[in-house]
Amino acid sequence: MTSKKEIEDALKIVKNKFYDPKLKTRFANYTKNIQFTFNDLNTTYLIKIRNGDLESLKEESIDSPDIQVIIESRIMIDILNKKINPMKAYTTGKLKAKGKLTDLLKLQKLL
C-alpha cells in the first residue's frame, strides 16, 4: 500500500510543473480548485490555482471543487511517473473525474 508520504512526494511533481514556462502560458488567467481524493489513504488534497499560479497544494477538502478526481494513490503515482497514461486510467475506470470537459483536458497537462 502506498503511504501518505509517497503521495505527497508524488504531488510535488504537479507542484513543480507550475514553474514550467509552457505550462504557465497554458494556464494563464486560469483559476480553479482541483480536488484529489485517495480513497485507499482516506485523504483528500486540494490544489488551488489562481490566475495560472499555484496558490496552494495541501491536505484539504471543499464541498464544490471545479474538478473532482477520485483515484487510488498507486495509480496516481504511476500516472505522475509516466507508467500509465491518464486517459487510459480514466477510460478503464481507475481514475474518476468530474468537472467541465475543458477543465478535464487542462488537468491532463498537469498529470
Regions found by a protein language model. Give the residues of each.
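Feature captures hydrophobic
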Residues: 1-111
